[in-house]
């Protein structure tokens, strides 16, 4: 008696293959991973999901005290709470996507070796679960933003607000792309796992999170190319400009960041697909 098979496992001959049809077929598994990531974050904690808000609030206060108060770094006339929180919302999303995606193979080697499913489900679930976390922090930003707006701060809201969803997708794409590349490399070079946290921290200081790009142009004009080459610079500057009307909004810089995101994402997919074929033999 013949049998009908719903799922056929075939050899992945194409390196540049998203296998989105397979990901969609396993959408229930994707949803389960997203739920697991969120629950795991605050499981057995007293405050639970409130940590999504507490972390950016206390970090913003620290930035206001250290960089705004002691160091006296300008925020281009933007209220410090709005300026720092805007940068943190974007940076935290990118950082979380990068850090967690970079541990995909090592953290899931047990299940990868036993059960078949499209491996892309795991890093995608990380990006989606962190998007939910970012949504909560973005709501916090809007509350703080609305407070200052109600007190008479003249924010110059503009059409760049329409780009905010694209900016968020770019942040997730960069985190996913870099994360897949690093995760693939750590299957052979375990030392990279210890460098990720340190490297990401340094990267934040090369990104206009605690300072505006205009200040760096005035203070260190010879080294501004380092910040411009950072694909996150245009994203954060455009995000701040969209809500305040202050910042460096440049279509050329933004186009560079968009192109960089596409390239890193495609490169990450190629390397990820290449490594997933035989990573169990390596690990």
Per-range role (PLM):
Residues 1-283:
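Hydrophobic transmembrane alpha-helices and immediately adjacent juxtamembrane helices
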């Amino acid at each position: 008696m013949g049998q009908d098979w719903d799922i056929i496992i075939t050899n992945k001959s194409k390196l540049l293959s998203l296998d989105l049809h397979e990901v969609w077929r396993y959408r229930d598994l994707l949803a389960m991973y997203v739920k697991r990531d969120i629950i795991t974050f605050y499981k057995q904690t007293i405050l639970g999901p409130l940590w999504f808000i507490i972390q950016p609030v206390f970090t913003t206060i620290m930035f206001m005290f250290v960089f705004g108060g002691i160091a006296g770094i300008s925020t281009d006339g933007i209220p410090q709470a709005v300026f720092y929180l805007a940068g943190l919302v974007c940076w935290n999303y990118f950082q979380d996507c990068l850090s967690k995606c970079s541990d995909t193979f090592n953290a899931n080697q047990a299940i990868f070796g036993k059960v078949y499913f499209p491996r892309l489900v795991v890093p995608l679930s990380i990006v989606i679960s962190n998007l939910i976390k970012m949504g909560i922090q973005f709501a916090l930003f809007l509350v703080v933003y609305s407070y200052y707006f109600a007190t008479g701060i003249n924010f110059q809201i503009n059409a760049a607000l329409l780009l905010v969803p694209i900016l968020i997708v770019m942040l997730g794409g960069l985190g996913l792309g870099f994360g897949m590349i690093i995760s693939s490399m750590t299957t052979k070079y375990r030392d990279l796992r210890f460098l990720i946290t340190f490297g990401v921290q340094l990267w934040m200081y090369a990104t206009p999170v605690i300072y505006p790009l205009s200040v760096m142009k005035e203070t260190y004009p010879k080294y501004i190319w380092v910040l411009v080459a950072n694909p996150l610079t245009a994203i954060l500057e455009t995000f701040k400009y969209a809500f305040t009307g202050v910042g460096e909004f440049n279509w050329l810089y933004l186009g560079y960041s968009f192109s960089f995101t596409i390239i890193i994402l495609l490169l990450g997919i190629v390397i990820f697909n290449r490594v997933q074929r035989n990573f169990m033999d390596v690990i």
